[in-house]
Amino acid sequence: MILNKALLLGALALTAVMSPCGGEDIVADHVASYGVNFYQSHGPSGQYTHEFDGDEEFYVDLETKETVWQLPMFSKFISFDPQSALRNMAVGKHTLEFMMRQSNSTAATNEVPEVTVFSKFPVTLGQPNTLICLVDNIFPPVVNITWLSNGHSVTEGVSETSFLSKSDHSFFKISYLTFLPSADEIYDCKVEHWGLDEPLLKHWEPEIPAPMSELTETLVCALGLSVGLMGIVVGTVFIIQGLRSVGASRHQGLL
């Protein structure tokens, strides 16, 4: 299976910025993946990205033949010629066709993706937030991610990353949904992949503290009142004892 993955991925170049300390035990502080590309016989046919510490720097749109930066401000300081990516994709296509002939078109094994949904910030009703759907262990890199609100498809405020590479040659992908948390809205991240027998729905809804019952509120108020009265009584006792001590001291002084 790993062999099949390696054949499909094509060229993968990794550059690591290594820690200056340590001789035998060298640890990478940062890892940049330059020219991560794959080509496959099913859509999307391929992808070319640059990554840094697991985050996407940019990808090359193979249809428009343009470099698309994850953070557009980076394009002011550095540039990348998309023709280099197109050449890599041509090599990947040729390599894939050759290996398919050599392997009698044996397909790679479909992995079962893992899905996690969480909010970017602590949830406060009515305050803007972002839902994050992390789809991990993707192989092959073909997946549909859809957001549902109360069972209905949502398209506004949705964005997603490219397929991001992992050391085991699988991929992960992240989908984002900007939204206003509401007590009467629930959300699902719907994932479709060849490794699943049916679409997977990962449920999310805001966690709202349950309101206290009238009995609980009464008990809390009574407890607070009792503690307050006890504090007054104890304070009064201490004041009386203090006054008596002062009076006794003065009496002894006169004697």
Curated annotation (Swiss-Prot):
Residue spans, topological domain Cytoplasmic: 241-255
InterPro entries to which the protein is assigned, alphabetical: Ig-like_dom (IPR007110), Ig-like_dom_sf (IPR036179), Ig-like_fold (IPR013783), Ig/MHC_CS (IPR003006), Ig_C1-set (IPR003597), MHC/Immunoglobulin (IPR050160), MHC_I/II-like_Ag-recog (IPR011162), MHC_II_a/b_N (IPR014745)
Extracellular side: 24-217
GO BP, sorted A to Z: adaptive immune response; antigen processing and presentation of exogenous peptide antigen via MHC class II; immune response; peptide antigen assembly with MHC class II protein complex; positive regulation of immune response; positive regulation of T cell activation
Segments of this protein annotated with the region Connecting peptide: 205-217
Principal place of residence: membrane
Tissue: Restricted to skin Langerhans cells, although some expression at low levels may occur at the surface of B lymphoblastoid cells.
SMART domains: IGc1, MHC_II_alpha
Disulfide bonds listed in the record: C133-C189
Protein keywords: Adaptive immunity, Cell membrane, Disulfide bond, Endoplasmic reticulum, Endosome, Glycoprotein, Golgi apparatus, Immunity, Lysosome, Membrane, MHC II, Signal, Transmembrane, Transmembrane helix
Keyword tRNA processing attached: no
Ig-like C1-type domain ranges (all copies): 113-205
Short name of any one Pfam family annotated for the protein: MHC_II_alpha
Chain spans, region Alpha-1: 24-110
Transmembrane segments: 218-240
Family stated for the protein in its record: Belongs to the MHC class II family.
Role played: Binds peptides derived from antigens that access the endocytic route of antigen presenting cells (APC) and presents them on the cell surface for recognition by the CD4 T-cells. The peptide binding cleft accommodates peptides of 10-30 residues. The peptides presented by MHC class II molecules are generated mostly by degradation of proteins that access the endocytic route, where they are processed by lysosomal proteases and other hydrolases.
This protein's name: HLA class II histocompatibility antigen, DQ alpha 2 chain
